[in-house]
Amino acid sequence: MRVSAADRVEILDVVGRADAAATRRDARAYADLFTADAVLDGTQGRHVGSAALLDSVGPIWAAEGPATLHLTLNPVVYPGDGPDEAVVQSILLIIDPAQPITIRTAAASTQTLRRHGATWRISRRTVAPATQPS
């Protein structure tokens, strides 16, 4: 099974918009990119459902400091379990933009997206410590 070029563009747009919303600390815009039954999990806990997601991201972002940039690096899109599902693996880099610029976090991100009508939405986002290549 393959993910079409048009779907890849839409999927990567959703992933990029999620990190842009996180940078702006816009919890509503962030949550709107997820399915109603979405799961966000990783080192900051496990949050299930869009309401829990909306409530949890504020404290998660606040723990990063007053301002951070969320950057998605090297995203690769893979087919998911069905024709309306895709998986994106990438590196999430969280940067403190104050001088001197510092990297706050480098993490491995795996996101599952499902087609929801004519759009794609994140159904699962797992953030884990980045590992060194062997």
Roles of regions detected by a PLM:
Residues 1, 5, 44-47, 100:
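Charge-dense, low-complexity intrinsically disordered segments
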